[in-house]
């Protein structure tokens, strides 16, 4: 329980469909997602890598792994927040993403932050 308070990262996600970058005829739907990462723990921690599982509504799944996020490996002191925007394309009007961040605390402790599944969905258009 003590480690949960010591190494605590909160993740919030907002998504938006990007119609200008999408091509429905080619089954390409592009979304931007903005992620806010807040260190709610008591130890400074650095985001060192990410792992995403991206699933289209048609069942196509792909995994993405890499160092940091948007070219950075942010170090978050207790109470600090880091926000970034990135994007992805899927082959259907709806899908989802989930994943994790791998973190290293300033005391050398390695831990993973789960990113709960969130929905990517083209808004309905009323005529």
From Swiss-Prot:
Q: Which PROSITE patterns match?
A: APAG (PS51087)
Some GO term, biological process aspect, for this entry: which one?
Answer: error-free translesion synthesis
The record, for Pfam families, names: DUF525
Provide the ApaG domain boundaries.
Answer: 3-127
Q: Which domain of life is it from?
A: Bacteria
Q: Which HAMAP family match?
A: ApaG (MF_00791)
> This protein is called what?
Protein ApaG
List the source organism: Nitrosomonas europaea (strain ATCC 19718 / CIP 103999 / KCTC 2705 / NBRC 14298)
